[in-house]
Design a protein with these regions (language model features):
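Histidine-dependent nucleotide/RNA phosphoesterase domain, centered on the 2H-phosphoesterase fold
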Residues: 6-137
Length: 137
């Protein structure tokens, strides 16, 4: 049984695990049609809550979110901003997001930097997204 995202984040301890949410596979296919990836390497599979968490860290309880915007640095990093529990603000101060696609030589973790530097363009209409609490690593 999960706990609220902030409690899961704050109580995650230290370790090599990553906790967050996976995207529902069927909805992922629909989202890839709705938001065509701009770069060749498609990621589009999860939202991170906390990296370097303990292996026994509790998973978050939230199961719904909203895709509320998009960012693209024009050089190979594209991400979709996600609102969870009414906020895009992750407890660590960064932004909840899905790394959507990457260009050659770019890495998913760079989405955090792009969002911090550029923010995101908010959509007129948010898109509901199913979230599956998961140990991502």
């Amino acid at each position: 049984m999960g706990v609220p995202a902030k409690a899961a984040h704050d109580g995650a301890g230290e370790g090599e695990s990553t906790i967050g949410w996976r995207l529902d596979r069927d909805q992922r296919r629909e989202l890839l049609q709705q938001f065509p990836p701009r770069y060749a390497k498609i990621v589009a599979d999860h939202v991170t809550l906390r990296s370097r968490a303990a292996a026994a860290a509790a998973l978050p309880e939230e199961t719904l979110g909203e895709i509320v915007g998009r960012t693209d640095d024009g050089a190979g990093v594209e991400a979709l901003a996600v609102s969870i529990g009414g906020t895009t603000d992750r407890p660590d101060g960064s932004t909840y997001h899905i790394t959507w696609s990457l260009g050659e030589g770019r890495e998913a973790r760079e989405s955090n930097d792009v969002l911090a530097e550029r923010g995101f363009e908010r959509f007129d209409l948010a898109m509901p997204v199913k979230l599956l609490p998961a140990r991502l690593r």
